[in-house]
Amino acid sequence: MIEAYRKNNPESQFGIAIADIDFFKKVNDTYGHNCGDFTLKELSRLFLERAAGKYTVCRWGGEEFCFFLPDLNLDQAGAVMQDVHAAVRKMPLHFADIDYAITITIGVEEYDFKSTTDVVLDRADRKLYMGKVHGRDQVVI
């Protein structure tokens, strides 16, 4: 999808973000895998509601999600992801009489017309990792 966008919009910029649920293993280990599945579904629902056709989000693997933010520069993509981050922090979760909350860490990068999509994804992933190393629950732009 991203490659098709680049081909059809060679002069357009876009943002890429990768989000990861903080301590997701703890959710599974503490409350069970059904609760973990519920968490992924609720988070997906929130992401899709916020996207509302403005950008694309998909599960990237495990508890990671990838966001494709067309026609946005780094600052604009970062602002969108700050809003997503804030929405997740406010999202109440209730499963089988358990009330709990989650946080996410997000790495945001921008396509710079020189790099391949893989390079941009790698840079976003490195920013995500830096956010994890420096305390989690943040957006690294």
Regions found by a protein language model. Give the residues of each.
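Conserved long alpha-helical elements within nucleotide-processing catalytic cores of c-di-GMP signaling
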Residues: 2-15, 22-49, 58-62, 66-67, ...
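Short catalytic/binding micro-motifs of nucleotide second-messenger systems
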Residues: 5-6, 49-54, 86-98, 130
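Residue-level recognition of strand-loop junctions within catalytic nucleotide-signaling folds
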Residues: 29, 68-72, 89, 111-112
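A short pre-motif secondary-structure segment
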Residues: 56-59, 100
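Catalytic-core segments of nucleotide cyclases and related cyclic-nucleotide turnover enzymes
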Residues: 74, 78-82, 96, 109-140
